[in-house]
Amino acid sequence: RSPDHYGLSVDEYQRHEYASRDKGWSANGVDIDAVITQVCDHDRFVGASLRLIRAMGLRRKESVLFRPFESVVPFESTGLPPEDKLADRYARIKGKGGRVRHIPLDSPARLAAVAFAQGVVSSQDAHMGNPAHDLRKNLRHFDYVLTKFGITVRERGVTAHGLRHEVLISHYEALAGTAPPVRGGQMVPPELDRQARQSVSRLAGHARIRASGAYLGAVRVQRHPGSRDADGMDDAPPERA
């Protein structure tokens, strides 16, 4: 079946085990704030989706289906252990395969993105798409608007999915203290690299740590004969981003 059947763009659907090129917007010369502001002025719904992607690293489908009131829940409703509490409120995201993850609303950017989205929708149970259209049409409209502003591989070398890459790369940098391999960062201690990659995978909604390689690039740590893969996982097909 085609990517469109699953509500995914080609870039989201294709398998990439290890990123060899930085697909983030900033790495390709895109002024992120300027583009998002322009899109918000043109179409507040698509602009709100972009703000959600930038704040939480969502897939475009997740951003369109996000319900800015119903999807915000107190920590007590997440089922996470008390020691994992990072915020009073969390965004409940239903990802691919029905997997649910909870993203802490622990920064001004995340809180502002949700507040903006709440100001756009017309009801407490609304999502970020046009309620008169089905998901496929809403996703096509999202793509149309981004194409209008030059967010294509042909024009700027990036896609909407590249904004998700931007967020996940930045998340790794914040935890590891350096850029990931795909952005030419320095080598870091194996355990620190593993912890940062695990956190990236969790934020992205992937079950396996190996999936982080699709955004960050290959692990660059010293390996010894007979050791397991540097990410500590057995060989397996990469997950779709």
Where are these regions (language model features)?
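Catalytic-site neighborhood detector that most strongly recognizes the C-terminal catalytic loop/helix
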Residues: 202, 208-216, 220-241
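Short, cationic motifs built from Arg/Lys/His that form the positively charged side of catalytic pockets
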Residues: 45-46, 58-59, 101, 117, ...
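Flexible interdomain linker/hinge and immediately adjacent N-terminus
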Residues: 1-35, 94-96
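Alpha-helix N-cap/helix-start motif at helix boundaries, enriched for small hydrophobics
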Residues: 61-66, 218
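Conserved tyrosine-mediated DNA breakage-rejoining catalytic core shared by Y-recombinases
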Residues: 65-113
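Short basic/aromatic active-site micro-motif
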Residues: 154-213, 228
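Basic, Lys/Arg- and aromatic-enriched nucleic-acid-binding interface segment
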Residues: 29-60, 201, 212
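Active-site/catalytic core of tyrosine-dependent DNA strand-transfer enzymes
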Residues: 106-177
